[in-house]
């Protein structure tokens, strides 16, 4: 028989759909449809970026359940009307502190510095992480990985990018002014 080994995972954004994606990934892994040790690349954006980082870190499912299901997300993501009105002015839905707070337990649980670069993250996980961000000035998608932006921090990094005549800071996987 021909064995098909899954080596690549793609996770889209979609806010609360993160929970559905997580459930599908967990059940399919438990049924041995895929194995994290065979994964070479993971692609994610927005909420899918958070799940992508979780998978790269190879936590066991019980620990992952505790992070995804039992975490008081409402204390991390304070969504209100003003947040939605200011999305374009801020060039992002949440500021950097929210993203750091979201990923902090995952990094600290594996004794990984919150300032880790994409290059170092690859060497720690041995999985090629691709996170997609949008240049809101040019409306272009940017693929961020250790191959394209090795010195960028996975969360909270510089550098300052110039897009046309406007400036936008890229902070890890999200854009912030």
Locate predicted features.
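Short, flexible turn/loop "capping" segments at secondary-structure junctions
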Residues: 2-3, 135
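Patatin-like phospholipase
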Residues: 3-10, 15-107, 141-164
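Short linear sequence motifs
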Residues: 14, 114, 168-169
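Short coil/turn segments at secondary-structure boundaries
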Residues: 80-82, 116-121, 175-177
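Short, structural beta-strand-to-alpha-helix junction motif
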Residues: 108-125, 159
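Active-site gating loop/helix substructures
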Residues: 124-177
């Amino acid at each position: 028989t021909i064995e098909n080994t899954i080596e690549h995972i793609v996770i889209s954004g979609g806010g609360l759909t993160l929970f559905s994606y997580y459930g599908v990934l967990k059940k399919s892994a438990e049924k041995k449809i895929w194995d994290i040790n065979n994964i070479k690349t993971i692609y994610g954006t927005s909420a899918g970026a958070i799940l992508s980082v979780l998978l790269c870190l190879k936590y066991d499912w019980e620990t992952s359940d505790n992070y995804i299901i039992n975490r008081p997300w409402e204390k991390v993501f304070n969504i209100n009307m003003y947040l939605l009105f200011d999305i374009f002015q801020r060039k992002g839905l949440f500021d950097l502190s929210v993203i750091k707070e979201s990923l902090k337990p995952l990094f600290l649980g594996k004794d990984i510095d919150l300032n880790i670069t994409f290059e170092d993250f690859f060497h720690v996980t041995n999985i090629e992480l691709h996170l997609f961000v949008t240049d809101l000035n040019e409306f272009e998608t940017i693929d961020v990985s250790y191959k394209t932006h090795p010195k960028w921090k996975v969360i909270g990094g510089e550098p300052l990018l110039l897009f046309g005549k406007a400036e936008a800071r890229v902070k890890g996987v999200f854009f912030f002014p």
